[in-house]
Amino acid sequence: MKFDILTLFPAMFEGPLTESILKRASEKGLIEVALHNIRDWAFDKHATADDAPYGGGAGMVMKVEPIAGAIEAVKAKRPNSKVVLTTPCGRPFNHQVAEELSREEGVVIICGRYEGVDERVRTLCVDDEISLGDFVLTGGEIAAMVIVDAVSRLVPGVLGSDESAQYDSFADGLLEYPQYTRPPEFRGEKVPDILLSGNHAEIAKWRRKEQMKRTLASRPELLDGIEWSKADKKLFAEVEKADQEKVAR
């Protein structure tokens, strides 16, 4: 999986890309992240990459020529890469979007800054626009880091076990079940007996119910449209009944 990141501040990526899972994935050749300074494609001696907005207004706007030049240079090497702009105007980033991107040959991420990019970047150069949520960041670099991290986890071999991604929150539409490790008791809080039983069928059933309980309590909107299996329908009915009884008390 190849990521090309177009940014005015490439040094911001040094920490996230040189530690932990992303570092190991890069060393193994499972992912490749190339940083491109947009100013390298500016035309003037000052490497100007932004200018005042037409029509007036506060702040500066990122110029179209340097961004277009950077994209063209990258696409000359990787013509099938998908070009993504990080922007509050984009579609919300979630697990499903990460899965979509993980199936691409490569992804080019444009990190927006200041008051945003010239509209012609969006109309002429971009395949997709992605937002982390209903808030505004100082720039798109942090959003790009999140996208690279989330997508890389889905690349085969990046995680120690492919099952790790399979059971992540949102992978099947539900939040992840509670996790425990040693010690078996801490400050009066014990690990559920079922997890110590060695009965893998019952453990799987408990974990599935806990996913349902946690999702119902914290993110009930995620339950809309889920196609339950017959066994899941029975489990969810038990979860709903217990929840209703709890509310009625």
Swiss-Prot record:
Keywords: Cytoplasm, Methyltransferase, S-adenosyl-L-methionine, Transferase, tRNA processing. GO terms for cellular component: cytosol. The keyword Transmembrane helix does not apply. Gene3D superfamilies: 3.40.1280.10, tRNA(m1g37)methyltransferase, domain 2 (1.10.1270.20). One of its GO terms (molecular function) is tRNA (guanine(37)-N1)-methyltransferase activity. It catalyses: guanosine(37) in tRNA + S-adenosyl-L-methionine = N(1)-methylguanosine(37) in tRNA + S-adenosyl-L-homocysteine + H(+). It holds the Pfam family tRNA_m1G_MT. It is an enzyme of class 2 (transferase). Its EC number is 2.1.1.228. It is found in: Cytoplasm. InterPro entries: Alpha/beta_knot_MTases, tRNA_m1G_MeTrfase_C_sf, tRNA_m1G_MeTrfase_TrmD, tRNA_m1G_MTases_N, tRNA_MeTrfase_TRMD/TRM10. GO terms for biological process: tRNA N1-guanine methylation. SUPFAM superfamilies: alpha/beta knot (SSF75217). S-adenosyl-L-methionine binds at residues 112, 132-137. Belongs to the RNA methyltransferase TrmD family. Homodimer. Specifically methylates guanosine-37 in various tRNAs. This is tRNA (guanine-N(1)-)-methyltransferase. The gene is trmD.
